[in-house]
């Protein structure tokens, strides 16, 4: 079930989403109609937002992030279903994509999502600029006619701050120049995505509105633990002050503190030991399976390379035999 991006936000209009600033004319093609129809899944937007937030938290400032878009394409209809992060380096103020990292990630995703193909790339920031053209040309070396999705996390508009582009070649001053043409898109959701998006929508930044049941339960637990910590800290400070002679002994308070300590569950029971060892075994088994999987992958790569080398040597021997 799909709805237009504007309708999903309660606003009209089916053309591309607005951004804070005017689009840079030098990289945008005017009067060009999109050649493909794009359906965008909310999971992609959530992945990009999560990627940007994590990088901002790590670096302490807003950072531009880059990733790959994967999905399905049938003729002129493109469905962007998922995404993954890409590594990049800055050389002389130009972004260079780590293609080896991309090929590794693509191989991993192909093992899980065999039906999904690489469709394009995404980044964050304002309107498209020449640096985006530079990165887009690198992506064109991997796939022909890739999509370009840009999310503006700093916008203050109520519309969805996502724009999708395709590249076109135009003649400017007698030279072939790559430009971006904006595409219209729709939001396509599946049942699992609708549940996840509904949960995120309930968790507002201001705390107003209806919160999810899980969030309310965690907030109540956090408040209770915070209060317990403050009370235990107060009792501990009183006991230390009594031992140091700073305050007089109050045997009634000390007896209540002693009784409170004995109310706590004893963690040396057989059931606790059994559950504890079971959990330790589960964690160790997961780590062991991960190591085995990594070792199998290494062995598989070694066998593939060995087979390639063996085949080359066999071909060489057969070719030499022809001359005799």
UniProtKB/Swiss-Prot annotation:
Domain MPN: 38-171
Keywords: Cytoplasm, Nucleus, Signalosome
BP term (GO), one: protein deneddylation
UniProt cross-references to InterPro entries, sorted A to Z: EIF3F/CSN6-like_C, JAMM/MPN+_dom, MPN, MPN_CSN6
Primary location: cytoplasm
UniProt superkingdom: Eukaryota
GO CC, alphabetical: COP9 signalosome; cytoplasm
Cross-referenced PROSITE patterns: MPN
Coiled coil: none
Localization per record: Cytoplasm; Nucleus
Pfam families reported for this sequence: JAB, MitMem_reg
UniProt GO molecular function: metallopeptidase activity
Function: Component of the COP9 signalosome complex (CSN), a complex involved in various cellular and developmental processes. The CSN complex is an essential regulator of the ubiquitin (Ubl) conjugation pathway by mediating the deneddylation of the cullin subunits of SCF-type E3 ligase complexes, leading to decrease the Ubl ligase activity of SCF-type complexes such as SCF, CSA or DDB2. The complex is also involved in phosphorylation of p53/TP53, c-jun/JUN, IkappaBalpha/NFKBIA, ITPK1 and IRF8, possibly via its association with CK2 and PKD kinases.
Assembly behavior: Component of the CSN complex, composed of COPS1/GPS1, COPS2, COPS3, COPS4, COPS5, COPS6, COPS7 (COPS7A or COPS7B), COPS8 and COPS9. In the complex, it probably interacts directly with COPS2, COPS4, COPS5, COPS7 (COPS7A or COPS7B) and COPS9. Interacts with the translation initiation factor EIF3S6. Interacts weakly with RBX1. Directly interacts with COP1 and 14-3-3 protein sigma/SFN. Interacts with ERCC6.
Family: Belongs to the peptidase M67A family. CSN6 subfamily.
Name of this chain's protein: COP9 signalosome complex subunit 6
Species per Swiss-Prot/TrEMBL record: Bos taurus (Bovine)
Chain's gene name: COPS6
């Amino acid at each position: 079930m799909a709805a237009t991006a504007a309708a999903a936000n309660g606003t009209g209009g089916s053309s591309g989403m607005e951004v804070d600033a005017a689009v840079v004319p030098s990289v945008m093609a005017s009067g060009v109609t999109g050649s493909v129809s794009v359906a965008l899944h909310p999971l992609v937007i959530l992945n990009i937002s999560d990627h940007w937030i994590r990088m901002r938290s790590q670096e302490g400032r807003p950072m531009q992030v880059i990733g790959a878009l994967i999905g399905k394409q049938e003729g002129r209809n493109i469905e962007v279903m998922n995404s993954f992060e890409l590594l990049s380096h800055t050389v002389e103020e130009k972004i260079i994509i780590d293609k080896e990292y991309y090929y590794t990630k693509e191989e991993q995703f192909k093992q899980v999502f065999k039906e999904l193909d690489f469709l394009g790339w995404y980044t964050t920031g304002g309107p498209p600029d020449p640096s985006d053209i530079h990165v887009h040309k690198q992506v064109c070396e991997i796939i022909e006619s890739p999509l370009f999705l840009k999310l503006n996390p700093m916008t203050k508009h109520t519309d969805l701050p996502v724009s999708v582009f395709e590249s076109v070649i135009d003649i400017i001053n007698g030279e072939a120049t790559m430009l971006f043409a904006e595409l219209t898109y729709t939001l396509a959701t599946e049942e699992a995505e609708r549940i996840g998006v509904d949960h995120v929508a309930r968790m507002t930044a201001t705390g107003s509105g209806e919160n999810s049941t899980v969030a309310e339960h965690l907030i109540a637990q956090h408040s209770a633990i915070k209060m317990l910590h403050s009370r235990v800290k107060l009792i501990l400070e009183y006991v230390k002050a009594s031992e140091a002679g700073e305050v007089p002994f109050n045997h009634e308070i000390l007896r209540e503190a002693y009784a409170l300590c004995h109310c706590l569950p004893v963690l040396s029971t057989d059931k606790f030991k059994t559950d504890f060892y079971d959990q330790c075994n589960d964690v160790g088994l997961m780590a062991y399976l991960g190591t085995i999987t990594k070792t199998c992958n290494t062995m598989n790569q070694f066998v593939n390379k060995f087979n390639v080398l063996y085949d080359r040597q066999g071909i060489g021997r057969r070719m030499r035999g022809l001359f005799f």
